[in-house]
Amino acid sequence: MSLEILVLVTLLIVTIWNIWQFFNILRRKAPHLFHLGDIESVVVLSDIHILDSIDERPNLIRLLSKIKPSIMIIAGDLFEREHRRMDRNSLRGILLRTLKSISWIREIIYITSLTSHDPILHTDVICMEMPGDVTMRITVLKGGLVHFRSNNTDFYVLHGDFLCRNGAYAGLINLLATTLFRRKLFLESLGKKFLKLEENSWLIMGHTHMVGIDAKRRLINCGCWKSYWRAKATGTLVHIYKGTPNLIHVSI
């Protein structure tokens, strides 16, 4: 194979790869929008990557019991190895097993990853209730965008694979943008523009495993709870109270 053909084939592969990664942006598809209304206290976290139960993250459980949020939003990758088609009963079973140690939380919003790790849903929204210390209401969204208001401030939550499918590639893009151009949270910034969100609203994402907060541009990445070759676990979550977001870190 000549050098010219090799270069052309390489360029073709790279082009196809990037079209696939950014397919939703290229076709200008919008995610399903789910409104929660007004909330005083909410916790947002992502990329927990649980194998069996949230008991694998004891420091997270202790932190949640201390904060006592009205609602917890899981912004994707709750699980590590559950990326398979799942009916309502199967989904209910694994969520009950996984979340029973925090059954005192009244409401959980779970945004699934579309491309890996999380269950593949047959519909955009599944609602269910779980028995526990209180009746826990769980709403599972198929790769949706969550919106809520806190103290007259708008917040949007997205996993991130809707923008760029592969998490490692998304993390690499953010790393290169930070290293070469000093542009932190690049994919989050791109997402805010693509989704046409208000400039004074906040966008909170996961997916890249690169934690960060930018108060000026109102961008946050939740970080992750499992170490991979590309990033160490950050042990971070976002607590929004009366319109003010705080990035909280615990040792894991």
Language-model regions, residue ranges each:
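Active-site neighborhood of phospho(di)ester-bond hydrolases with catalytic His/Asp-centered motifs
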Residues: 44-46, 72-77, 107-116, 141, ...
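Conserved beta-sheet core of the metallophosphoesterase superfamily
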Residues: 128-137, 151-155, 161, 167, ...
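Catalytic core of the metallo-beta-lactamase
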Residues: 26-32, 52, 151, 157-163
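Short, basic, glycine/proline-bearing loop/turn elements
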Residues: 41-48, 81-84, 172-180
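Acidic, histidine-bearing metal-coordination/catalytic regions of metal-dependent phosphoesterases
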Residues: 1-41, 251-252
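Short, motif-level signal for alpha-helix interfacial/capping segments enriched in acidic residues
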Residues: 23-32, 54-57, 138-139, 183-193
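Core catalytic region of metal-dependent phosphoesterases/phosphodiesterases
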Residues: 10, 35-39, 50-150
